[in-house]
């Protein structure tokens, strides 16, 4: 998975409760 605050693309899987938004792994609201 991609660590928080790291760059990501599309539906990349971010670690923990984070989602790929605006090219970054951000917290899911």
Swiss-Prot record:
<keyword id="KW-0872">Ion channel impairing toxin</keyword>
<keyword id="KW-0800">Toxin</keyword>
<protein>
    <recommendedName>
        <fullName>U-reduvitoxin-Pbi1a</fullName>
    </recommendedName>
</protein>
<feature type="disulfide bond">
    <location>
        <begin position="14"/>
        <end position="25"/>
    </location>
</feature>
<feature type="disulfide bond">
    <location>
        <begin position="1"/>
        <end position="15"/>
    </location>
</feature>
<keyword id="KW-0108">Calcium channel impairing toxin</keyword>
<comment type="function">
    <text>Binds reversibly and blocks P/Q-type voltage-gated calcium channels (Cav).</text>
</comment>
<keyword id="KW-0960">Knottin</keyword>
<keyword id="KW-1218">Voltage-gated calcium channel impairing toxin</keyword>
<keyword id="KW-0528">Neurotoxin</keyword>
<feature type="disulfide bond">
    <location>
        <begin position="8"/>
        <end position="20"/>
    </location>
</feature>
<comment type="similarity">
    <text>Belongs to the venom Ptu1-like knottin family.</text>
</comment>
<dbReference type="GO" id="GO:0005576">
    <property type="term" value="C:extracellular region"/>
</dbReference>
<dbReference type="GO" id="GO:0090729">
    <property type="term" value="F:toxin activity"/>
</dbReference>
<keyword id="KW-1015">Disulfide bond</keyword>
<dbReference type="GO" id="GO:0005246">
    <property type="term" value="F:calcium channel regulator activity"/>
</dbReference>
<keyword id="KW-0964">Secreted</keyword>
């Amino acid at each position: 998975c991609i660590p928080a605050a790291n760059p990501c693309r599309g539906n990349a899987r971010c670690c923990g409760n984070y989602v790929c938004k605006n090219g970054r792994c951000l917290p899911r609201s």
